[in-house]
């Protein structure tokens, strides 16, 4: 009886491990960069093993030039709901590009919350080939020196700049997009009929989950970052007489 019991348990465990993994958060048509997530999984698994062997071990964090011990559970990095394609933890600066959101950065020692794969735009993108233009000009960069931000409640919070995992310093980066200029052309937004419309370009924001600090504790909070440049229109008052 005991031999049959152990045989059934072994078969059950093999079946669970062989079950295909699905991710309902993945948009249709998007694929996962396997090389990137293999490296990420290795780093996280190593951190989890050390965390289990040394319970409540603090992770060193450097905030505004000072070293402080911030208690962080490495398992937080594995929660899907915290992932954002605009937040990146990396041991080295990501590629700097003013025209692209390079979400496929796969350098060693990178923790990105993004699980999607997007094609990189370049000067050969069809938009440029067809002679199409954007109504507003934008610039996109990875920001790695953010120290404070506004959270979703309107309060100013301290952004955690770096965390130390397995003696490797991971820096927190944010991919931000903002307007290059308020008025790309003299009349306002490009391509807008200035006879009937007033227009100007403005930077819009969204909220992403970021690692912040409060009272010597690290916590995830929604903070506001720049994410797009849009055109604002107002109709001109008709002339009288």
Swiss-Prot record:
Report one GO cellular component.
axon
Q: Which UniProt keywords apply?
A: Cleavage on pair of basic residues, Disulfide bond, Endosome, Glycoprotein, Growth factor, Metalloenzyme inhibitor, Metalloprotease inhibitor, Protease inhibitor, Secreted, Signal
Organism's domain of life?
Eukaryota
What residue ranges constitute the propeptide? 19-121
Its Gene Ontology molecular function terms? growth factor activity; metalloendopeptidase inhibitor activity; nerve growth factor receptor binding
Which N-terminal residues, if any, form the signal peptide? 1-18
Gene Ontology BP, a term: cell surface receptor protein tyrosine kinase signaling pathway
Could you tell me which cysteines form disulfide bridges?
A: 136-201, 179-229, 189-231
Read off the InterPro entries from this record: Cystine-knot_cytokine, Nerve_growth_factor-like, Nerve_growth_factor-rel, Nerve_growth_factor_bsu, Nerve_growth_factor_bsu_mml, Nerve_growth_factor_CS
Coiled-coil parts of chain:
none
Residues the record marks as carrying a glycan: 69, 114, 166
Localization per Swiss-Prot or TrEMBL: Secreted; Endosome lumen
Instruction: Identify the Pfam families for this entry.
Output: NGF
Subunit annotation: Homodimer. The homodimer interacts with a single NTRK1 chain. The homodimer interacts with a single NGFR chain. The NGF dimer interacts with a single SORCS2 chain (via extracellular domain). The NGF precursor (proNGF) binds to a receptor complex formed by SORT1 and NGFR, which leads to NGF endocytosis. Both mature NGF and the immature NGF precursor (proNGF) interact with SORCS2 and with the heterodimer formed by SORCS2 and NGFR (via extracellular domains). The NGF precursor (proNGF) has much higher affinity for SORCS2 than mature NGF.
> What family name appears in the similarity comment?
Belongs to the NGF-beta family.
Q: What does this protein do?
A: Nerve growth factor is important for the development and maintenance of the sympathetic and sensory nervous systems. Extracellular ligand for the NTRK1 and NGFR receptors, activates cellular signaling cascades through those receptor tyrosine kinase to regulate neuronal proliferation, differentiation and survival. Inhibits metalloproteinase dependent proteolysis of platelet glycoprotein VI.
Q: What is this protein called?
A: Beta-nerve growth factor
Give the organism the record lists.
Mastomys natalensis (African soft-furred rat)
- The coding gene here is NGF
């Amino acid at each position: 009886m005991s031999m049959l019991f152990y045989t059934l348990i072994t078969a059950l465990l093999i079946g669970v491990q062989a079950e295909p993994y699905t991710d309902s958060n993945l948009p249709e048509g998007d694929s996962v960069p396997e090389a990137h997530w293999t490296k990420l999984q290795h780093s996280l698994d190593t951190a989890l093993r050390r965390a289990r062997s040394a319970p409540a071990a603090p992770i060193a964090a450097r905030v505004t030039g000072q070293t402080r011990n911030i208690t962080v559970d490495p398992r937080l990095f594995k929660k899907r709901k915290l992932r954002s394609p605009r937040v990146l933890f990396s041991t080295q600066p990501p590629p700097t590009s003013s025209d692209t959101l390079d979400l496929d950065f796969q350098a060693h020692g990178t923790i990105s919350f993004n699980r999607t794969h997007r094609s990189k735009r370049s000067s050969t993108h069809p938009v440029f080939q067809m002679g199409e233009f954007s109504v507003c000009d934008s610039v996109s960069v990875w920001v790695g020196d953010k120290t404070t931000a506004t959270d979703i409640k309107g309060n100013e919070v301290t952004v955690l700049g770096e965390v130390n995992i397995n003696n490797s310093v991971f820096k927190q980066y944010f991919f931000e997009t903002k307007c290059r200029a308020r008025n790309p052309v003299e009349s306002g937004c490009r391509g807008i009929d200035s006879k009937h419309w007033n227009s100007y370009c403005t930077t819009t924001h969204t909220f992403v989950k970021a690692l912040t600090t409060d009272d010597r504790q690290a916590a995830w909070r929604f903070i506001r970052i720049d994410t797009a440049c849009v055109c604002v229109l107002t109709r001109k008052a008709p002339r009288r007489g």
